[in-house]
């Protein structure tokens, strides 16, 4: 009897329809998910945090807001209703308190970049911007940091940067005199050429020819294609697509975009290596390449890491600069009195316009600060994972399994911190004006702490030079009829804020 029992059980199992097995496994998975959702909603420490009831059960509403490019507005509406800390998903909390935000992002806080940042790598390995491990990030950052200091940029690169900016302004001026100039496109080309030139000595004549470097084109395609998203959100569909892509050319272009990008990126490494020993055109990858050749145990990079970092630097250094300049020009051209004052200020500069001279112009710098406050290029989510023991923020305990988010759209527009927060008022930044301590720690258009933007000084240099040269060479510029308040509404496009129309045109 005992010996036959297992056999009978096996026969019984063999006769169970396959459909039933799928239903059983699927049902068990659904039940486990429901149990986890209910545990999180009703037993997690996060249950005490204010927020809409549905956020305790699902992130669907938040996901829809992200998909619709209006996450910043949705999250802000929750802050307006529930306060400076709000639950936006079952295990996701958004904070609009400047003191808590500083606690999260300061050096040594224990908070690390959330898993979301895996999406921001164009290659198969982590890069300078999405490392979650603080030590790995620090080691990689040291390879590039010296080249991005303000003194280094002014001594080695300012003439090159100024020439690229000046040519861009002339192209804008020419187009504007012929009809209209689409400035977002031109500023993007300017930033592309600058970053390519500094990082790997590439991007030659991008502005002059009006076309992007092939590596930049492939990078943009890679970061925006379906395969990149499926790889992170639906791996089975991604691998199915790669399998089918071997037989279907159209699918091959989509699902093998990473390989195509790396093929285009081979010239990045080749150009960087060729310039390494040259007395003239050096680049920011010189130290990284040298460390790799010496087989250093600390910091040596292989070709894959070089290409991936080049892609990350281009993503972080191109669109943000272009978008910041676009909104700055739009803000000023909407205010004729301010435009006249700024044109007069830059007209008073003697000789060649230098970054140091621009840094001393009060109106120019006040305009840059205020446009970055209202229309900074990164208005959206900056998610972080808490330390292993969790953290207390705004009086609430946040467990290590949660994700804590801050967004500059809320920090830069808080009525508790800023007077008339939604009004463009450059005078708040002029010498003699007094900003509250909360305002000072709230203003972080380039991030803060150890993860502050590596290229912050390069960004500021381009903003200063481009603003000065534009208003010196294009006095009397005005917005084209196609550029309206509606077309310039900022949308939260995944990793950057941009105009709804994705363009901004001016005339002379």
Curated annotation (Swiss-Prot):
Keyword set includes Phosphoprotein: no
Main location group: membrane
An annotated GO cellular component: membrane
InterPro entries assigned: Cyt_P450 (IPR001128), Cyt_P450_CS (IPR017972), Cyt_P450_E_grp-I (IPR002401), Cyt_P450_sf (IPR036396), Cytochrome_P450_monoxygenase (IPR050121)
EC class name: oxidoreductase
Source superkingdom: Eukaryota
Gene Ontology molecular function terms on file: heme binding; iron ion binding; monooxygenase activity; oxidoreductase activity, acting on paired donors, with incorporation or reduction of molecular oxygen
Subcellular localization, as worded in the UniProt entry: Membrane
Residues that hold heme according to the record: 453
EC number assigned by the record: 1.-.-.-
GO biological process: aflatoxin biosynthetic process
TM regions (residue ranges): 18-38
Glycosylation positions in this chain: 192, 209, 302, 408
Keyword presence, Heme: yes
UniProt xrefs under PROSITE patterns: CYTOCHROME_P450 (PS00086)
Cofactor: heme
Key words, A-Z: Glycoprotein, Heme, Iron, Membrane, Metal-binding, Monooxygenase, Oxidoreductase, Transmembrane, Transmembrane helix
PANTHER family the UniProt entry points to: CYTOCHROME P450, CYTOCHROME P450 MONOOXYGENASE STCB-RELATED
Protein family (similarity comment): Belongs to the cytochrome P450 family.
Protein name as annotated: Cytochrome P450 monooxygenase aflV
Organism: Aspergillus parasiticus (strain ATCC 56775 / NRRL 5862 / SRRC 143 / SU-1)
Source lineage: Eukaryota, Fungi, Dikarya, Ascomycota, Pezizomycotina
């Amino acid at each position: 009897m005992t010996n036959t029992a297992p056999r009978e059980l096996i026969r019984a199992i063999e006769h169970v329809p396959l459909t039933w097995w799928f239903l059983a496994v699927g049902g068990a998975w659904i039940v486990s998910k429901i149990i986890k959702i209910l545990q999180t909603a009703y037993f997690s420490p996060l249950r005490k945090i204010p927020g809409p009831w549905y956020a305790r059960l699902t992130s669907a509403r938040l996901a829809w807001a992200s998909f619709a490019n209006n996450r910043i507005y949705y999250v802000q509406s929750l802050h307006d209703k529930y306060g400076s800390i709000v639950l936006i998903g079952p295990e996701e909390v958004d904070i609009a308190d400047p003191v808590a935000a500083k606690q999260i992002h300061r050096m040594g806080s224990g908070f690390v970049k959330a898993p979301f940042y895996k999406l921001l790598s164009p290659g198969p390995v982590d890069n300078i911007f999405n490392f979650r491990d603080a030590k790995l990030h620090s080691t990689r950052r040291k390879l590039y940091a010296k080249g991005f200091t303000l003194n280094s940029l002014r001594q080695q690169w300012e003439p090159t940067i100024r020439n690229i900016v000046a040519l861009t302004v002339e192209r804008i001026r020419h187009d504007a005199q012929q009809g209209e100039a689409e400035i977002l496109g031109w500023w993007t080309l300017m930033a592309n050429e600058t970053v390519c030139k500094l990082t790997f000595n590439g991007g030659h004549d991008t502005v002059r020819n009006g076309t992007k470097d092939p590596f930049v084109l492939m990078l943009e395609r890679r970061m925006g294609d379906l395969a990149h998203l499926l790889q992170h959100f639906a791996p089975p569909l991604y691998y199915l697509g790669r399998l089918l892509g071997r037989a279907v050319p159209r699918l091959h272009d989509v699902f093998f975009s990473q390989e195509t990008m790396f093929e285009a990126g081979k010239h990045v490494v080749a150009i960087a290596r060729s310039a390494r020993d040259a007395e003239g055109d050096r680049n920011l990858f010189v130290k990284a390449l040298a460390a790799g050749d010496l087989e250093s145990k600390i910091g040596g990079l292989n070709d894959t890491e070089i290409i991936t970092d080049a892609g990350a630097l281009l993503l972080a250094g191109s669109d943000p600069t272009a978008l910041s300049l676009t909104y700055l020009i739009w803000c000023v051209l909407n205010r004729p009195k301010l435009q006249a004052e700024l044109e007069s200020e830059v007209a008073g500069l003697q000789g060649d316009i230098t970054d140091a001279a621009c840094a001393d112009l009060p109106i120019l710098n006040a305009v840059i600060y205020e446009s970055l406050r209202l229309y900074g290029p990164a208005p959206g989510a900056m998610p972080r994972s808490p330390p292993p023991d969790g953290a207390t923020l705004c009086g609430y305990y946040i467990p290590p399994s949660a994700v804590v988010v801050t967004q500059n759209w809320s920090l830069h527009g808080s009525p508790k911190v800023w007077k008339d927060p939604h009004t463009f008022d450059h005078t708040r930044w002029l010498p003699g004006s007094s900003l509250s301590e909360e305002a000072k720690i709230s203003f972080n258009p380039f991030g803060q702490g150890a993860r502050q933007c590596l290229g912050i000084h390069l960004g500021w240099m381009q903003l200063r030079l481009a603003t000065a040269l534009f208003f010196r060479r294009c006095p009397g510029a005005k917005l084209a009829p196609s550029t309206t308040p509606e077309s310039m509404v900022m949308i939260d496009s995944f990793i950057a804020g941009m105009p709804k129309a994705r363009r901004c045109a001016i005339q002379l």
